[in-house]
């Protein structure tokens, strides 16, 4: 369900079918203020509502996401075993989920997470442009730099995939990154 009014429409249809104490979970990229409003709507009907930030992309879909639930008091004890079973785990085995708090806190934390991620992506783009246009570096040389950074304090998924993208050549020895349009779209979740 797309974030925004479609969530409200489905919630309006779903609520009459539920029983007191049931939990509704919004795992989309909803605005935290919308989550606050939906909590009030549900609690007025005896329901619990959880707004849960979900992170992990394709890897998270395959191996478990990082989850950031927040919402109605009392909901966590009901959903905790399920969320812990499906969440990603760290290399040391710690589960990648924790109750963030009441209200729209889960979606608020996801909004902050997205803002940091968008900032990181912009820094990577700016660095790429300086290396390519300012320093005249080749894709292979840039890939090696990102590879070194990924073995240190800057170790991250975004640095890793940037390294891999810059190193990739097709069967004809062409690096597709040289043909990617220098433009980006967005779904609107970064506007808040």
Residue ranges, per PLM feature:
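Rossmann-fold dinucleotide-binding core
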Residues: 6-12, 25, 31-143, 151-174
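Intrinsically disordered, low-complexity terminal tails/loops enriched in metal-binding residues
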Residues: 15
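A conserved active-site cap/scaffold subdomain adjacent to cofactor or substrate pockets
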Residues: 177-192
């Amino acid at each position: 369900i797309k974030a925004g009014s479609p969530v409200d429409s489905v919630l309006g249809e779903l609520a009459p079918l539920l029983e007191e104490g049931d939990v509704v979970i919004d795992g989309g990229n909803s605005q935290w203020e919308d989550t606050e409003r939906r909590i009030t709507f549900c609690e007025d009907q005896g329901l619990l509502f959880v707004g849960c930030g979900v992170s992990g992309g394709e890897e998270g879909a395959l191996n478990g996401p990082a989850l950031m639930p927040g919402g109605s008091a009392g909901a966590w004890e009901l959903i905790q075993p399920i969320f812990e079973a499906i969440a990603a785990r760290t290399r040391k085995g710690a589960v990648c989920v924790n109750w963030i708090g009441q209200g729209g806190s889960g979606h608020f934390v996801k909004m902050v997470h997205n803002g940091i991620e968008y900032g990181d992506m912009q820094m990577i783009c700016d660095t790429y442009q300086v290396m390519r246009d300012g320093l005249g570096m080749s894709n292979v040389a840039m890939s090696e730099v990102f590879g070194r950074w990924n073995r240190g304090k800057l170790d991250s998924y975004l640095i890793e995939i940037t390294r891999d993208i810059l190193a990739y050549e097709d069967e004809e020895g062409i690096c597709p990154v040289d043909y990617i349009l220098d433009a980006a779209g967005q779904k609107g979740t970064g506007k808040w």
